[in-house]
């Protein structure tokens, strides 16, 4: 990594990636990396959308800050992430970048993370338990990013499985939401604990809670401010008025 850019090094530090892991990823999925060249034209058009994403966010939340966005080649660990600094940036793993419309949603989601101002204690997802946030906090953090990305891009956040099983999911989630085990709900694509359910259903629960709060608010700009500056996640859940439907949409 002698010639690595500052932002590739930042990505490496955040994801814990090293040269060996990158080489292994290329050997494991050569097609993914050989396709990067063909994606560059699409990335050029996606980059052209970045400023419009910021402009639309600024329109609904004028006090938002515009971070830098950088594309790097990673080891396939994440489509996007942000740096944990006082002046955070968005880092996009180009090897996992899909079509331009999906990429716009990824950029918008990560952009929202750079705007979130939550209590420092609980910000981490690993390490000592006292530093980690509850499942409720982390799910709202991810779900609110999906909601605001939806507002900015116009691309709906859909999950057919979750929509059909929302009441069941909420019953299970609410029993675990004050714990710090994320394995059944978040960042669990390769975790057998999720069973036969799709991965990352905590994103959906957090999205539904946040959407309920936003939809009930008369002042939408204030609602976005509230969502980005939550201090008490249990209180926010109560204020959202979230209550899952007893039946899936269209069910009788």
Predicted regions and their residues:
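Residues in flexible loops and secondary-structure boundaries
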Residues: 9, 77, 100, 148, ...
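N-terminal mature-domain "stem" immediately C-terminal to a signal peptide or N-terminal signal-anchor/transmembrane
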Residues: 1-28
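Acidic helix-start/capping segments at beta-turn-to-alpha-helix junctions
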Residues: 1-7, 69-79, 229-233
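Acidic/His-rich structured neighborhood in mature extracellular/periplasmic domains
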Residues: 18-162
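Residue-level recognition of alpha-helix termini/interfacial anchor residues
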Residues: 1-7, 11, 33, 161-176
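Pan-zinc metallopeptidase signature
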Residues: 162, 170-252
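Structured segments of extracytoplasmic/periplasmic soluble domains
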Residues: 3-4, 56-64, 114, 118, ...
């Amino acid at each position: 990594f002698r010639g690595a850019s500052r932002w590739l090094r930042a990505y490496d530090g955040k994801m814990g990636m090293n040269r060996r892991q990158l080489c292994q990823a290329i050997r494991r999925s050569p097609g993914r990396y050989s396709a990067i060249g063909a994606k560059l034209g699409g990335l050029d058009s996606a980059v052209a959308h970045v400023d419009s994403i910021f402009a639309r966010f600024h329109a609904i939340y004028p006090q938002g800050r515009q971070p830098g966005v950088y594309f790097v080649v990673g080891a396939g660990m994440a489509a996007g992430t942000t740096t944990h600094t006082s002046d955070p940036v968005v880092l996009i793993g180009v090897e996992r970048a899909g079509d331009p419309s999906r990429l716009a949603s990824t950029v918008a989601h990560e952009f929202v993370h750079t705007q979130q101002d939550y209590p420092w204690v609980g910000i981490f997802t690993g390490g000592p338990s006292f530093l980690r946030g509850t499942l409720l906090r982390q799910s709202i953090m991810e779900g609110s990013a999906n909601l605001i990305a939806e507002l900015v891009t116009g691309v709906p956040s859909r999950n057919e499985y979750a929509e059909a099983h929302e009441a069941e999911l909420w019953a299970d989630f609410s029993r675990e939401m004050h714990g710090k085990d994320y394995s059944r709900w978040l960042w669990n694509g390769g975790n057998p604990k999720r069973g036969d359910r799709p991965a990352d259903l905590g994103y959906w629960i957090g999205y539904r809670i946040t959407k309920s709060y936003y939809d009930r608010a008369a002042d939408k700009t204030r609602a976005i401010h509230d969502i980005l500056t939550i201090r008490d996640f249990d209180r926010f859940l109560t204020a959202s008025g979230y209550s899952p439907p007893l039946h899936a949409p269209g069910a009788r």
